[in-house]
Amino acid sequence: MSNRLPRALLADIAAVIGSGDHASALMRLGDESGPEASAAVSSYRAQCAAALGDFDAAERHLRVALDLVERRMTALPADEAARARLAAALTILPPADAPVTPTLEVISPELTAVRLRRMLAAVFMKAGRELDAEMELALLPVEARSL
């Protein structure tokens, strides 16, 4: 379970968001009661909010998601092999709006943080906040700065 939703349901939500079916994802996510405990769930809520044009809610959910993965990153020891995999992954990133899975959140909070920040920059671009988007992208490694 992640944020009180079974992982199989979260995989289904990621798939429907990936197909562009935000309406179905919104229904599967249910209400927003309680604290969010999963960056993936927060990012799914953000993507649904952005699809509805509620960019403030999308930003809020993505900030929660970033906070969750950044806290996880500080709790994990540095791993040279993981850094090498991250460097390789940065060269083949999916589109900025590609859903983040709960598994990726656990396996690589660093890559998850990069993807969430790119997602936030894309939300800012959709909202007409180009300067905010540029500032978010500037926080990323050079390889990850394009949308």
Q: Which residue stretches match the model-derived regions?
A:
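"A position-specific structural signal for the A-helix of alpha-solenoid helical repeats
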Residues: 11, 44, 112-115, 119
